[in-house]
């Protein structure tokens, strides 16, 4: 009598694996967003809403995150609600430097959340070579045409999220994540005794 065990593939992981978050912290992220839900009459800033959306999106938990403006730096965690209110966005939108930094850290797939145009479109496009970008625009209309071109050039995705509805940003973050990885099932078949 032969005993056998069918080996099943590992369940598909919904982790982002080699994908990182690239969050715009330039000066324009300090702009307030009109909201009907403001409890104390204080309007939230774009940066506050961005940090909240990332904190509240379970699929983003555990992902490596980078903040960028003139510089780009990896962060250990998304600022808490209290810490976010103390955060002061400054500088410009140096996408070239941001792409170079995340690639140097080994990330070639990134979810870019931004409200503006880069300092240099040509340099940003060149620095994005070899990357795949999920781009989420959170600024005011009109949408910068360059961001759509950048998504196409990197075989990525493009979405717009209205910051007056944070749920739109949370949904856009989830949709920009790479699909679960297709891992090879273990080799083998039956075990005979």
Residues of each region from the PLM?
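Negatively charged sequence features
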Residues: 1-14
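Residues that scaffold, gate, or flank divalent-cation-dependent active/transport sites
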Residues: 24
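C-terminal "exit" segments of structured domains
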Residues: 164-193
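Residue-level marker for buried hydrophobic side chains located in beta-strands
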Residues: 19-21, 112
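VWA/integrin I-like adhesion module and closely mimicked acidic/polar interface patches used
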Residues: 86-89, 116-164, 170-174
């Amino acid at each position: 009598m032969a005993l056998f065990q069918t080996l099943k593939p590992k369940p598909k992981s919904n982790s982002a694996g080699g994908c990182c978050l690239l969050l715009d912290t330039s000066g324009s992220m300090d702009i307030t967003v009109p909201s009907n839900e403001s409890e104390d009459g204080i309007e939230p800033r774009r940066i506050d809403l961005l940090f909240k959306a990332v904190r509240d999106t379970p699929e983003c938990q555990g992902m490596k995150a980078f903040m960028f403006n003139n510089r780009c730096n990896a962060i250990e965690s998304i600022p808490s609600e209290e810490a976010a209110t103390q955060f002061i966005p400054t500088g410009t939108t140096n996408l070239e430097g941001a792409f170079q930094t995340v690639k140097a850290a080994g990330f070639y797939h990134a979810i870019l959340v931004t409200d503006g145009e880069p300092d240099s479109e040509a340099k940003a496009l060149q620095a994005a070579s070899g990357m795949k970008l999920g781009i989420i625009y959170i600024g005011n209309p009109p949408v910068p045409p360059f961001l759509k071109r950048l998504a196409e050039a990197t075989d990525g995705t493009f979405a717009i999220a209205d910051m007056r509805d944070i749920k739109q940003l949370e949904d856009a973050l989830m949709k920009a994540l790479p699909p679960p990885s297709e891992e090879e099932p273990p080799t083998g078949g039956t075990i005979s005794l």
